[in-house]
């Protein structure tokens, strides 16, 4: 199953993206004072000897001679003060590096180093100069084209990848380096264009090799748009995959040097060397996804993203924890994702939702026919709709190996699920709780092909405008209701056709609001009072509200596991919230409180039948509560799943 990694784990409760899909942690520190009146002598910084370098070479600054007369050096802080701006890697270490910029004439760069000792005293700044010389005169451009081998799917939808027929495609936007053939020092760096072409200048009569890096980089020394996206094996402390064809040639050569990256996989699907093209196939799908966003907003600043291909086997997911990254599978004997473009673009959709919109999706396993928590239904449905939009292909395919044959699962986001049960596949039918309804609606909003109930053809820009605008700030949870309400408000001329499209998915459109307040449809597999109302309204100082929690559709992230409550504070005040569960088998009731999409507080004590928190001086406004018993609403389930009542009061 495709799933997201939870972004916040409290008492065994997986709650993704409670604080914008992530969360910071702080620790209690300690302080000490010394007695005896000793005076701390400031440390002494040494930035090393002045250096000379050639454009394109990696330069290492050296602060290792810094010292503290009566203690130790605790930290280093390097800054550039003069010259063409460069990006320092490891600017808080003793030996940071940077790539000498391309210059036409000799240029001096100056760097400053300040060190701090173990008692907090800082040194006077020490400086060092690096003179960067232009490449030798008489140089000519080294040019070429980079391509990678993509393995296509077999024509039959139930068959998987056709390893016998790889296709060379341009490797777009990737870093290319000229390496000195002997020392392997980087002499020049550039990026390929949208056809895979590259060119750079190196010193005349130099033997070089060309290295391709699985990284797209446009850093803060360049105007918007910017990005830094890489594919590597693992997340912390590793470098991107690279490929070199091992060919050395003279920089004076008049012919282009093309690089064709092979799959490293035999026709039968077994490894036949280094699987070289995989990282570049992944990165090319990421490139295509970024172009979709740039077509809507040409000045987008993309946060750094790592794609981890190879280090884990726990499904595919996006997580903002630590370094934002997408995890993909790489097991040829079972499931590998480098050529599954819809899978990659789906996870990139979660990255987009997290960084530019809002992702209230709590994550967890999901599949066709599941009746999901409406936040999960929207997040996962958006992911596959976004993938189809990026690739302009409504047929999503996911390859795997069944032990004897290459296989694939597939579905068409263009095909509206049937509105009656059991549906095909079984249980797959129109619902606000269905990811298939969400992806069908969003695809039909985008595409320009008219079909049954679909006369909408808005393209991607209106979808993007809703995501970065009202969907980001909605006081409701992000669901199909909040999205469609905003889409209609921003596209008044298309309201009638949008209503027709949405109504075909068993969703009420008359007087629709962001909360789905007027919704009357629910799947027959879940009791009506466990699905509706979608939000129960609690009155401050009023009586308790009672809501069923059920596991009829499954546990963790399925419809009826968790219940939503709304309450409003008319003025700033202190408010106490109490929740309890009727579960007689080791109950564990928990709840989370939100305001305007932001996590406010929550109750996550060890298993207990009742939980209570107090919000001190809570500002006026509307609040949402996500309340559940861990027997039904946690991943993994804790206790005995079943049908219980949740009782909640707000005072």
Placement of each model-derived feature along the sequence:
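Short pre-active-site segment immediately N-terminal to the catalytic Zn-binding motif
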Residues: 328-344
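Non-catalytic extracellular/lumenal accessory regions of secreted precursors
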Residues: 493-574, 582-584, 600-607, 647-651
